[in-house]
């Protein structure tokens, strides 16, 4: 069930503060965050945000297509290495 339009998008306050500081200073360094639940806002377009996946920070460059999605969608937490090969068929 999606979030109510009346409430507006959820973004952690500390992340909004860091985004505003990066825009004012014109700094292109990645913004480190653990907030995977925060929604991507139009203010974040063009910035690189390093999103934590449980082990390390994955750099995510924010483009127009990502607005409205959550940061965690672009930082995978699980690695899929494929199914085990069938040894009998060889």
Swiss-Prot record:
PROSITE patterns recorded: RIBOSOMAL_S19
GO biological process, one term: translation
Gene designation: rpsS
Gene3D superfamilies according to UniProt: 30s Ribosomal Protein S19, Chain A (3.30.860.10)
Taxonomic lineage: Bacteria, Pseudomonadati, Pseudomonadota, Gammaproteobacteria, Thiotrichales
Name of protein: Small ribosomal subunit protein uS19
Keyword hit for DNA-binding: no
Transmembrane parts of this sequence: none
InterPro entries: Ribosomal_uS19 (IPR002222), Ribosomal_uS19_bac-type (IPR005732), Ribosomal_uS19_CS (IPR020934), Ribosomal_uS19_SF (IPR023575)
One MF annotation (Gene Ontology) recorded for this entry: structural constituent of ribosome
Domain of life: Bacteria
Purpose of the protein: Protein S19 forms a complex with S13 that binds strongly to the 16S ribosomal RNA.
UniProt entry keywords in alphabetical sequence: Ribonucleoprotein, Ribosomal protein, RNA-binding, rRNA-binding
A Pfam entry, by short name: Ribosomal_S19
UniProt-listed PANTHER family: RIBOSOMAL PROTEIN S19P FAMILY MEMBER, SMALL RIBOSOMAL SUBUNIT PROTEIN US19M
GO cellular component: cytoplasm; small ribosomal subunit
Family named by the database record: Belongs to the universal ribosomal protein uS19 family.
């Amino acid at each position: 069930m999606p979030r109510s339009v009346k409430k507006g998008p959820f973004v952690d306050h500390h992340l909004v503060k860091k985004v505003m500081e990066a825009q004012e200073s014109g700094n292109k360094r990645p913004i480190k965050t653990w907030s995977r639940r925060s929604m991507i806002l139009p203010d974040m377009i063009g910035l690189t945000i390093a999103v934590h996946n449980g082990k390390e920070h994955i750099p995510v460059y924010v483009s127009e297509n990502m607005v409205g999605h959550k940061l965690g969608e672009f930082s995978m937490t699980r690695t899929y290495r494929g199914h085990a090969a069938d040894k009998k068929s060889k």
